[in-house]
Amino acid sequence: MNISATVTVRDLATGIPGATRVFENFGIDYCCGGHRTLADACQEAGLPVEDLTRSLEEAGSAPQPGSGRDWRQESLTALTEYIIDTYHFFTRQELDRLENLFDRVCSRHSENHPELFEAQKTFYQLKQDLIPHMLKEEQVLFPYITRMEEAAVEVRAIPTPFFNTVRNPVRMMMTEHDTAGDLLRQLRGVTKGYTTPPDGCVSYQTLCQALAAFEADLHHHIHLENNILFPRAVEMEETSAPDFYKSAGEFNEHRCFGR
């Protein structure tokens, strides 16, 4: 893939194996902010575009761990199942673990580090948002995407859902992704980049490490939905029901790929 300053972060994240790890290392938002060009993202982060380009080239030529599945080519049903089994499972598991860690660390260190209460409050808001968010995806949006794909494969009409068009829940999910991204940035700021203070105990260190890992996982989770699943679902529905889309108006592709 051609790597240049004018290519969007989204296209680099989906087209280059290992690109998401590079973006994580440089602090580049590739999930909710994937619509920006590489040049714009570097300017916002205060980074030389040459450094990021070089790292992306190295990542693209390096052997990649894992399954190596190209989710741009796999079925949408397989992708939704992967998201649920891998990311939703991990998110629920870690939210409970992080809540317990916050309780423990706040009880021991809040006197010297009152900012912990702000971090805990932000985390609770994130948890309260993510739990129903994942349920809506699992119970409403993802099943419809599966039914839509089955109808497309069998060349039959797509059943009209109660939400009229897949674009409506997609917009809602992406708005909620934006909120989650904002809360993660607040958490990172309050904790000074998930840094353990000199007087922090092992539990404090574990909390900071777990928050950093949770952030990276949620970034990739949202990337798969915002930049691959949702655009493909919208495109499939549009291709299967072009007359409906003509009357409904254009879908804002840039909004689908991030703010």
Located regions from the model:
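Small-residue-biased structural context
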Residues: 1-259
